[in-house]
Curated annotation (Swiss-Prot):
Species, as recorded: Homo sapiens
Entry cofactors: heme
Family, per entry: Belongs to the cytochrome P450 family.
Taxonomic lineage: Eukaryota, Metazoa, Chordata, Craniata, Vertebrata
Protein name per Swiss-Prot or TrEMBL: Cytochrome P450 2A13
Record keywords, A-Z: Endoplasmic reticulum, Heme, Iron, Membrane, Metal-binding, Microsome, Monooxygenase, Oxidoreductase
GO biological process: aflatoxin metabolic process; coumarin metabolic process; epoxygenase P450 pathway; xenobiotic metabolic process
EC number: 1.14.14.1
Effect of G369S: Decreases phenacetin O-deethylation activity 9 fold
Length: 494
């Protein structure tokens, strides 16, 4: 009995020493790191965080420690930036220092630093430069891609008319349409809406994207080194990501067999041609792994964010029928009902433009942004960030900065209108991030949002099975991503 008591006392003493040593080490190594709650060994600040509402947890901590603070997600140390000023100072004013890519544990399981989105250094620069130039070559930002979006919008209108006003979940109607635009660029063709493989891909994308926003997804961000070996929802997310990689790899193999170097059909062909041109360059970043992962980056990003924004937007308009009515009025007055909307119409449609911006602001698809990393020892404000320090630029805190938006928690298109009813830009509108790692698909996404949104609203009015006052527009999950609640609606022809 005495021996077991002594053993217990010894264990408790050892644990106490470990905790004290950990705190001392953290403080010593931190130097002038931003302040933050004291972490415990291995679990970090887990006990102070609500993994169901990670964004809100971090914002609550900022109330105590200020707009720049340090948090420990398990053993992972992260500096968090809140509000317009802190985010802009880091990502724009000190753009080079903050241009590294941090960890996103779920996606890192697959990408492992390859591809344009999650790479660093010279690899990121080369792949980004190539991707921007190649997308432009295939019409992004030009009339060519606008015609492709208009064509796809026509297919969507036909599909929605085919529902005959029945109550439907719009999720896959929207994701099929949006995905087909990026598919035509990276794969050279669109998918049929009933293609089973296509629908399976969309489910995989949606499943893995939604996992990152769940409580388990946030836990995985903290304890990935352990959880990747355990059963749980993360294993299903890995399975979905692997399925997406396998699909892309199969597409690449087909293009390799049928490649004509003088006539590239799509993004994959263009990358394969660049691989041939650089095959004698020992430092090339143009090889199969980067091709597969970059293509998957484009396919994923080009589908989920725009389709989820539209899905959130329709829910908000059913909650606010007076906004829907004003958009209908502006569409009828500027475009009419006898021609398709064009991107140039937006210059004459300030209210619709304000509504789309407010949907993006309120929807806040990536509230914590993609993690950044400082690529050298960096002085930021009065703090010192050692090389490799991870940084969360809280984009949601910029989109809700009360200095820029009078009622940031409310959906209100007036946030983007001046006193004369004209559209007004805002420096705090950052859904595509800012700085050197801004989303280079921003131009394509803006065009898609405007053309799909106006074409759908030109042809339909929305009806919810619930009355407006009963519609819940709070998100289902807010983690890495913001996911709107599942809902059904009717598209009633106008």
């Amino acid at each position: 009995m005495l021996a077991s008591g002594l053993l217990l006392v010894t264990l408790l003493a050892c644990l106490t020493v470990m905790v004290l040593m950990s705190v001392w080490r953290q403080r010593k190594s931190r130097g002038k790191l931003p302040p933050g709650p004291t972490p415990l060994p291995f679990i970090g600040n887990y006990l102070q965080l609500n993994t169901e509402q990670m964004y809100n947890s971090l914002m609550k901590i900022s109330e105590r420690y200020g707009p720049v603070f340090t948090i420990h997600l398990g053993p992972r140390r992260v500096v968090v930036l809140c509000g317009h000023d802190a985010v802009k100072e880091a990502l724009v004013d000190q753009a080079e220092e903050f241009s590294g890519r941090g960890e996103q544990a779920t996606f890192d399981w697959l990408f492992k630093g390859y591809g344009v989105a999650f790479s660093n250094g010279e690899r990121a620069k080369q792949l980004r430069r190539f991707s921007i130039a190649t997308l432009r070559g295939f019409g992004v930002g030009k009339r060519g891609i606008e015609e492709r979006i208009q064509e796809e919008a026509g297919f969507l209108i036909d599909a929605l008319r085919g529902t005959h006003g029945a109550n439907i979940d719009p999720t896959f109607f929207l994701s099929r349409t949006v995905s087909n635009v990026i598919s035509s660029i990276v794969f050279g063709d669109r998918f049929d809406y009933e293609d089973k493989e296509f629908l399976s891909l969309l489910r995989m994308m949606l499943g893995s994207f939604q996992f990152t926003a769940t409580s388990t997804g946030q836990l995985y961000e903290m304890f990935s080194s352990v959880m990747k070996h355990l059963p749980g929802p993360q294993q299903q997310a890995f399975k979905e990501l692997q399925g997406l990689e396998d699909f892309i790899a199969k597409k690449v193999e087909h293009n390799q067999r049928t490649l004509d170097p003088n006539s590239p059909r799509d993004f994959i062909d263009s990358f394969l041609i660049r691989m041939q041109e650089e095959e004698k360059n020992p430092n090339t970043e143009f090889y199969l792994k980067n091709l597969v992962m970059t293509t998957l980056n484009l396919f994923f990003a080009g589908t989920e964010t725009v389709s989820t924004t539209l899905r959130y937007g329709f829910l908000l308009l059913m909650k606010h029928p007076e906004v829907e009515a004003k958009v209908h009025e502006e569409i009828d007055r500027v475009i009419g009902k006898n021609r398709q909307p064009k991107f140039e119409d937006r210059a004459k449609m300030p209210y619709t433009e304000a509504v789309i911006h407010e949907i993006q602001r309120f929807g806040d698809m990536l509230p914590m942004g993609l993690a950044h990393r400082v690529n050298k020892d960096t002085k930021f404000r009065d703090f010192f960030l050692p090389k490799g320090t991870e940084v969360f630029p809280m984009l949601g805190s910029v989109l809700r900065d009360p200095r820029f938006f009078s009622n940031p928690r409310d959906f209100n298109p007036q946030h983007f209108l001046d006193k004369k009813g004209q559209f007004k830009k805002s420096d705090a509108f950052v859904p595509f991030s800012i700085g050197k790692r801004y989303c280079f698909g921003e131009g394509l996404a803006r065009m898609e949002l405007f053309l799909f949104f106006t074409t759908i609203m030109q042809n339909f009015r929305f009806k919810s099975p619930q009355s407006p006052k009963d519609i819940d527009v709070s998100p289902k999950h807010v983690g890495f991503a913001t996911i709107p609640r599942n809902y059904t609606m009717s598209f009633l022809p106008r």
